[in-house]
Structures are given as structure tokens and as C-alpha cells.
């Protein structure tokens, strides 16, 4: 089938509690399909909404008191049965999950305050809906109107039967959503130009990146199996390329670390029970919550990661998850009377620390860092450090890593993994 012949998306927009309300369903259909006889619309449309896999976008908006602009709380999901999934969110998840508790509060105050888009297509299958769900998360992360974006997984799929249709089907979906609500769903070119889109954890990884990520996650699992038995800090050494390819992998990796190894306990899909059986979950345990940080040397990138973490609910305030190395060292240090940390006096430990551009860490003190060796200070404050390191990118004498530094920090248990840039 040619791209022009692909079936167009079927999109219904209705109040969230109205899935059982025949009148509301008919009203939503009439809005999209005009004066067509409902009996014909039912046969051609309702079948793909209620009997096929669908993707859904639940949203609620509040006005920002300072800017008077609308701010959206959004949940994106996919399901094989939209009716049952809606009932699950309303009756079960609203009692146990923070994201759905918030929607429930809003519904109690005003039944018209929470709506959902239900997206169907005659060519939808499980893999295709998972890809659509993942890209919707990716795009909505770059929407300025979205304040909070909820889901608990990255779902980019590998090869499958209708994969060659995905880009066209998604573009048609986004174009129609943009037509219906341009504030929540801005034009594609606006989304793709945003810094959050470029650093999003929802990019689809290449085979090399996936292999590197799985190796790192496996090494983390092994490291925690050891550190759960003793207090020895471990370091996972990742050798990688610079640029956008690295940023995409680091963002994707950190999101997986937080949502899988920190064990949020949220599973969105009834078919996702296998997530409970992952190696990392078995090692850590469902109720053993951990804290992870991402350290970045550049202030602008710290800001971008902070925005992503806040939108995805990984932190409640700024600088809780993404920090500069000096901020992290200060956070986990005994304090002087002026509030500054003492690098030689660690206080407490983070569970997992992901260090971007570890080659830029200082190996001697300077005006902004009173310690003697940043890599050493980070290890003393962390149970496991994942260091992304490229010795060819060292820029200053204060960042020079001597052979003895490398031998001391990267003993036989390190992970040395290189991934390459591929278009």
C-alpha cells in the first residue's frame, strides 16, 4: 500500500468519565464526521476505537496565575481495550498512583476538567501503537504548554510488519491533533526545534546504542548485587563519542535507571508484567527505592535535564536530579558555617550517579573547586558511578588524567564500551 493510500487516523475527543456515555461518544463522532449517518460511522469508526489497539492522551489544564497561559498535565498510554483501561485508571489507579490521584481530584471538583483523545487506525497493531505512544511522549515533552507528562516507560520498537508505515501514520495523527488543539500539540517543526526534544529520552536508539545501554544496565545490576553486600563504591567506565548521539543515549539511559532501578512501582499496561521480572528489579526489590543523579559540566545542559526531569515527574523542584559535579560534591559534604561543602568530608551517599563528559572532571583544585580530585570525591559519595569518558576531549591541564589516576579509578571490574555515531 502506498503512503497516500494509508488509512487516516480516527481520533475521538471526549470527557474522561464519558466512555460509557453513548450520547457523549456520539457527540464526539459527530464533531469529527459531520452529518454522516451515525450507523455508517459506527461501522467504520467505533470498531477501530473499541475493538482494535488504541493510543490515548489524557489531559487536564489549569491556568498559570503568573502568565495566564494554560498548563497541561498529560498522560499518554496505549491499550488493547480502551474501555477496560479507562475503567482501570478511574477505579483502581486513582487509589494507588500519584498521577491518577491528581486526575481523580480534578474530576471530583469538575467532571469536565479531564478529557482524553482516543486514537485509532485500521492498521494499528501492538508494536505500532507502542511506537505511536513513544513518539507522542517524545513530541509532548517538547511542547511548552505541557507542565507534567506521565507514563512510565520508553517503548520504541524494533522491526515489525507495518514499521514502514509508522512515520506517515504518526505524521497524520499529529497533524490532526494539531488541528484540534494547536496549543497542546504544536506544529512538528516547532517541536523538533526545542532543546527538550533534542535531549529527550524517547529517541529511538540505534542497535549500537541499545547494545551499549543493555551492557551498562547489566553492569549496574551486577554492581548493586555486590554493593548490597558491602560498602565498596563501584565505577562503571563508558568510553563513548561526543555530540548528539551521546546525549541521546545518556538521556535514555538515565530515564531507564530512574524508572527501572529506582522502581517507581508503576506499570501502565496489563501486558507489561514482564517488567517485574527484569534483572534490575529482582536484584533491588520492588519496595527498595534508590536515588539517582545525572552530573553535567555545562550549565545549559543541566537546565535542559532539569526541565526534562521536572516534566516527567522525576523531581519536584529544580536541581534535585541534574547537577554540576561541584553542586553534587557540596550536597553530599559536611558544611562550613557559610554553607559550602568540605570536599574532604563526605556525608551520605547517592545510589547511582551518571557523569556525562567525565573527562572534564578536575583532577586538581581551582578557584571554584577546593578539593583535590573530582573523580575521587564523586566515588566517595556514591555507591555506583557511571562515568562517560573520552580522553581525547580533555581541554585543560586541571583535567589531565595521569596513568596512575586511571589505574586507581578503573580497576579490573570496569566496563569499557564504545559506541559509534551512525545516521
Indicate residue ranges for each PLM-predicted region:
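Short hydrophobic/aromatic beta-strand immediately N-terminal to the Walker A/P-loop
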Residues: 235-239, 293
Amino acid at each position: 500500500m502506498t503512503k497516500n493510500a494509508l488509512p487516516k487516523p480516527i481520533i475521538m475527543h471526549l470527557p474522561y468519565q464519558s466512555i460509557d456515555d453513548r450520547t457523549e461518544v456520539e457527540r464526539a463522532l459527530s464533531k469529527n464526521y459531520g452529518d454522516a449517518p451515525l450507523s455508517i460511522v459506527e461501522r467504520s469508526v467505533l470498531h477501530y476505537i473499541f475493538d482494535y489497539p488504541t493510543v490515548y492522551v489524557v489531559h487536564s489544564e489549569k491556568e498559570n496565575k503568573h502568565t495566564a497561559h494554560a498548563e497541561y498535565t498529560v498522560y499518554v498510554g496505549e491499550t488493547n481495550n480502551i474501555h477496560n483501561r479507562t475503567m482501570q485508571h478511574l477505579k483502581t489507579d486513582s487509589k494507588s498512583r500519584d498521577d491518577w490521584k491528581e486526575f481523580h481530584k480534578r474530576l471530583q471538583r469538575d467532571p469536565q476538567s479531564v478529557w482524553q483523545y482516543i486514537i485509532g487506525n485500521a492498521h494499528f497493531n501492538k508494536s505500532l501503537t507502542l511506537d505511536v505512544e513513544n513518539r507522542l511522549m517524545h513530541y509532548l515533552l517538547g511542547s511548552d504548554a505541557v507542565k507534567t507528562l506521565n507514563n512510565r516507560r520508553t517503548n520504541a520498537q524494533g522491526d515489525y510488519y507495518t514499521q514502514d508505515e509508522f512515520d506517515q501514520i504518526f505524521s497524520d495523527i499529529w497533524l490532526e491533533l494539531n488541528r484540534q488543539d494547536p496549543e497542546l500539540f504544536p506544529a512538528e517543526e516547532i517541536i523538533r526545534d526545542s532543546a527538550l526534544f533534542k535531549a529527550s529520552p524517547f529517541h529511538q536508539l540505534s542497535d549500537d546504542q541499545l547494545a551499549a545501554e543493555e551492557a551498562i544496565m547489566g553492569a549496574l545490576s551486577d554492581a548493586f548485587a555486590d554493593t548490597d553486600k558491602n560498602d565498596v563504591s563501584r565505577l562503571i567506565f563508558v568510553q563513548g563519542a561526543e555530540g548528539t548521539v551521546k546525549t541521546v543515549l545518556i538521556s535514555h539511559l538515565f530515564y531507564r535507571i530512574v524508572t527501572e532501578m529506582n522502581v517507581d512501582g508503576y506499570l501502565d499496561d496489563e501486558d507489561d508484567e514482564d517488567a517485574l521480572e527484569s534483572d534490575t528489579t529482582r536484584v533491588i526489590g520492588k519496595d527498595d527505592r534508590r536515588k539517582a543523579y545525572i552530573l553535567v559540566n555545562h550549565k545549559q545542559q543541566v537546565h535542559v535535564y532539569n526541565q526534562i526531569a521536572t516534566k516527567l515527574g522525576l523531581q519536584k523542584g529544580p536541581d534535585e536530579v541534574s547537577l554540576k559535579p561541584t553542586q553534587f560534591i557540596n550536597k553530599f559534604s559536611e558544611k562550613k558555617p557559610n554553607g559550602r561543602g568540605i570536599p574532604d568530608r563526605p556525608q551520605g551517599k547517592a545510589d547511582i550517579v551518571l557523569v556525562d563528559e567525565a573527562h572534564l572532571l578536575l583532577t586538581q583544585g581551582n578557584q571554584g573547586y577546593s578539593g583535590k580530585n573530582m573523580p575521587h570525591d564523586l566515588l566517595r559519595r556514591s555507591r555506583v558511578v557511571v562515568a562517560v569518558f573520552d580522553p581525547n576531549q580533555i581541554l585543560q591541564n586541571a583535567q589531565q588524567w595521569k596513568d596512575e589516576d586511571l589505574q586507581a579509578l578503573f580497576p579490573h571490574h570496569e566496563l569499557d564500551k564504545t559506541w559509534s555515531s551512525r545516521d
